[in-house]
Swiss-Prot record:
Protein name as it appears in the record: Defensin Tk-AMP-D3
Family label: Belongs to the DEFL family.
Xref: Pfam families: Gamma-thionin
SUPFAM superfamilies attached to this UniProt entry: Scorpion toxin-like
Alphabetized SMART domains for the sequence: Knot1
InterPro entries referenced in this protein's UniProt entry, alphabetically: Defensin_plant, Scorpion_toxin-like, Scorpion_toxin-like_sf
GO annotation, biological process: defense response to fungus; killing of cells of another organism
Function, as annotated: Plant defense peptide.
Disulfide bonding pattern of the chain: 3-45, 14-34, 20-39, 24-41
UniProt keyword annotation of Disulfide bond present: yes
Keyword entries, A-Z: Antimicrobial, Disulfide bond, Fungicide, Plant defense
Amino acid sequence: RDCKSDSHKFHGACFSDTNCANVCQTEGFTRGKCDGIHCHCIKDC
């Protein structure tokens, strides 16, 4: 099961899944992707 959370460190509009994922990894998540203009972090629960 995936747990999703808005990124707390990502600033600005999200246009790159790679940038979002890199920021999410610094927050303890395994991956991340853009959802609209927001960066959402994902990890296994």
